[in-house]
Amino acid sequence: MMERFEKIEMKIPAKAEYVAIIRLTMAGVANRTGFAYDDIEDMKIAISEACTNIVQHAYKEDVGEIAIVFGLYEDRLEIMVADNGVSFDFNNLRSKVGPYDISKPVEHLPENGLGLYLINTLMDDIQIMHDEGMTVLMTKYIQREQVENDGNPISTYNSY
């Protein structure tokens, strides 16, 4: 039996001025799903980076579309960001990025690839598929319990 979930789909022009719409939509969906503020902020950065990569790399001269699908599950939010443009080799780029080395001057930071490193760091799971374009599937699990200073768990659920 398939796991039940709700799906929200959107398409926007692959232009920088539309990325904020996706970020705000994702924040609303994540808030409704029960995510903590810090997790929502992390997901906002991750989805912004994924969309910005498409805007910068996928469509050279043409203006294409970004397709976004939110999968709302009981324990997680899956976010798929896809394009039909030119792919780049994520695994090759991923191998070139990593944690910031404090001993290196700021001038030596890589210009490209830091966004993918951020996505990988901020999300619980990330999968990349190269077909006709590129699809990024990001997953964030809901942390239902948090611990107060005295060590007692508190629920993030509203108690209405």
From Swiss-Prot:
GO function terms (MF aspect): ATP binding; protein serine kinase activity; protein serine/threonine kinase activity; sigma factor antagonist activity
Catalytic EC class: transferase
EC assignment: 2.7.11.1
Catalytic activity: L-seryl-[protein] + ATP = O-phospho-L-seryl-[protein] + ADP + H(+); L-threonyl-[protein] + ATP = O-phospho-L-threonyl-[protein] + ADP + H(+)
UniProt key word Transferase: yes
One Pfam match: HATPase_c_2
Keywords tagged on the record: ATP-binding, Kinase, Nucleotide-binding, Serine/threonine-protein kinase, Transferase
Domain of life of the source: Bacteria
Record NCBIfam families: PRK04069.1 (NF003144), rsbW_low_gc (TIGR01924)
Protein's job: Negative regulator of sigma-B activity. Phosphorylates and inactivates its specific antagonist protein, RsbV. Upon phosphorylation of RsbV, RsbW is released and binds to sigma-B, thereby blocking its ability to form an RNA polymerase holoenzyme (E-sigma-B).
Protein family according to the UniProt entry: Belongs to the anti-sigma-factor family.
Name of the protein this chain belongs to: Serine-protein kinase RsbW
Annotated organism of origin: Bacillus cereus (strain AH187)
Gene name for this UniProt entry: rsbW
